[in-house]
Amino acid sequence: TVIGVAVIIACMAIGLNWHPLYLSGDTWMIIVGIYIAIASVTPVWILLQPRDYLSSFLLYGMMIVAVIGIFGAHPTIDIPAFTSFVDKGTVGSGVSLGTMFPALFVTIACGAIHSLVASGTTSKQLDKEKDALPIAYGGMLIECVLAIISVCAVGYIWSEYVPGGIVTPTAVFATGISRMCAKIPFLAGAESVIYSLLILAVSAFCLTSLDTATRLARYMFQEFWLAPGETYKDATGIKRVLTDPYFATIITVVLGIALGMTGYAKIWALFGASNQLLAALGLLAVAAWLGKVGKNNKMLIFPMAFMLIVTVISLLQTIYANVTNAVDMWSWIRAIIGSLLVLLSLVLAKEGCQTLFKKKA
């Protein structure tokens, strides 16, 4: 741990003071693509786990600096309690955020994906099952603290954010916190350094998501072609090629880089609803398992149904908005993807009813 943290600090010092790398976005995509491809096929304990562990020090360091900035500067929050349901972050955009329901429940979507993350990575890093309790609950509390810090950062520079001067979420967060810290005497001269470190910390979070998501996408691509209980080692012919871990990783990474280079933001609006569909799937899996082992699963049925309803309503709104206000090819692509997700939601609802309410022989 000491050596790892020391190397991180040394690398940051070198990058900030002597040898910063200025590469194009496409070049960084290729570099990151190579990294996540390697991370996807190597055992968790070799690369993913130690990298996650060392990145956590950046997280805690960032949060400590942010808390010092908030309590030390006593910032005035100039954001109004309510603005409107229209996005004012980009001048003249006129993009509607939609109604409070279901937008609120598909915006706060970060928890849904972790049911999948736990299946392929978290479960391999637990010493015993009970360790999941403090990890899950502690992670939720830390995430809540980070959410409050983010609101404070946005509120502190709201007057600059509204006109469109600072538009990217990462820049908004880093600017707000670094300017708070600049108000504190012993941090007054370190605003640019703190800004860079905050950007680095956020980038490290994104990297943890990328390599884990690539591993999970590779799992799902392989399982798509396999029968229940079958592994890629049992497959033959073209199925053996499609389910090979290296081939599946290449397909996953290439598609990701292609989306990144061609305009992933065009379909990003569907992320929230599609992610909540995964939440419903996770709840269904746990409810089915509890029912199979003879334990009470009723506490999971309502949230599963709620997530399905929220997902379908949000997707229908998205489809309607893109069809009635189609401006380019991407509008129709979003409408088609949204329609497919609605179909998947209905299939999931049918499977859920059959699984949870079927009569025992």
PLM region descriptions:
Residues G92-V106, I148, Y156-E160, P185-F205, ...:
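Select transmembrane alpha-helical segments in multipass membrane proteins
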Residues T1, H19-M29, I46-S55, Y161-T168, ...:
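Transmembrane helix-loop boundary segments of multi-pass membrane transporters
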Residues I70-V86, G138-I177, T212:
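Extracellular/periplasmic helix-exit of transmembrane alpha-helices
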Residues G138-V145, A190-I194, E223-M261:
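Loop-to-transmembrane helix boundary motifs in multi-pass membrane proteins
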Residues T42-S56, I113-L146, G165, L216-A217, ...:
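Hydrophobic, small-residue-rich membrane helices and short re-entrant helix-turn-helix hairpins
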Residues G25-T42, I68-P75, V86-E129, L133-G138, ...:
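Hydrophobic, membrane-embedded alpha-helices of multi-pass small-molecule transporters
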Residues A6-I30, I38-S40, V44-W45, Y60-D87, ...:
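Hydrophobic alpha-helical segments and their helix-loop junctions in multi-pass secondary transporters
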Residues I36, L59, C206-R218, T252-G256, ...:
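Hydrophobic alpha-helical segments of multi-pass membrane transport proteins
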